[in-house]
Every structure is written in C-alpha cells, then in structure tokens.
Amino acid sequence: LYGAPGWRLGLLAMNENNIFGRLIHELPVDEQAAINDRYRLVETDPDKLPFIERIAADSRSIGLYHTSGLSTPQQMMEVLFALTHLVYANGSTDAYIDECRYVVNRRYTDLVKGLGIEADNSRTNAKYYTLIDIYKLAEEKYGKQFRKYFEKSFAQIDFLMKLSEDNGVILMDGVGFGTQPGIIRVSEANLPSKAYGVIAEKINELLEEYCEKYLKTKK
C-alpha cells in the first residue's frame, strides 16, 4: 500500500461481529456480486470473507493476498524461484530473469543519477535495495559545515518523517537493518520505474529545504 515492504504502520483489531461486515451484506444484490467478484480470485466463497481479511487482501494486489502468511502457493513459488538457478548453472539464460535484472538496474540507475552519487556496479550489489547516507549526501551537496549542522540538529527519522509528510515518499530507516545512523533504505523491487527519479528529486528538495534553514541561522 505504501511501497515500503515490511514496515507496519499500525495494528488493527476488530470484533468478529462488526458493523462493516453487516453493512456489506446489506448492500444491494448487484453491489454484493461486484464485491464478491473482486475477492473470488483468492477465496472460493467470498461472501463469507470477514471484513478484516478483506482489508488484508486490499493492503496489496489481491492476487498476492496469500503473502500475508506462508501459504502453499507461496511455498511453490519459492521452489520455482530456486529451480531457476539450474537454468544458469547449465549455461543457459532466462528471458524473465534477465528482464527483471534490467528493470531493477534501471531503477537503481535512475535513483543514484538523480541523487548525483556514484553507482555501485560491483557484482556483490544486487541493486534490489539501496542504502543512502543522507549525512554524506548533505556534505557532498552543501559542504562540511552544513553536514555538521544537519547531523547535530536532525536525526534520520526526522528526515524520513518529513519526507513522508511533505512529499509523500515513505522510505525505511537503515538502522533496523544494521546500519549506522543516517542511512536510509530504498527498495527497487516494488514501485513503478518512473518513481525512482521522483524519489531522488524529493530527497534533493528536502535537503535543499534543510540547507535553507541552515543558511538562515548564519545571518
């Protein structure tokens, strides 16, 4: 829903007999039929699907509803993913895998080029996730003195919160992945390709805004 896999923004609890489920069943027959068609892909009897399960299904593409738990289809997909390595082990290639690599690489390139930072094209960089040091980026763009001000005055969580509130871009705090403070994480896995240039643009705009605040303190 937010393009931030693994980030839980809240907890939802609901009585088994709730008003939402009742209101759905009080809808006109044609509207109920349309709703049932929506969930028929993942539920053989969608009319009995609890409202809270509908929310879980709608938190992503409904066809991916099973990813809210380790289901048999998900286990089968894991097996198929593992078997794809046999293709490359035999010296062959796979058009789908090659296309996925191309798409992820293009998104990564758009991101780092937009930020004006050097790309890491080493074999160990899968480019699935990108870790960005916002303090280092601040120094590269506006100098050491600004970095000192920025690092002393704002935590990376302040940057992330403002980025989401003002620019609608939600990224992850890298500390949860074992990084040092100041690192934010971008996933190249799940957003439209055109979004990565926009993410870079919004990060740059926010850094510029912080720099303007810094310059005002110097007057």
Positions of PLM-derived features:
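PLP-dependent class I/II
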Residues: L1-K219
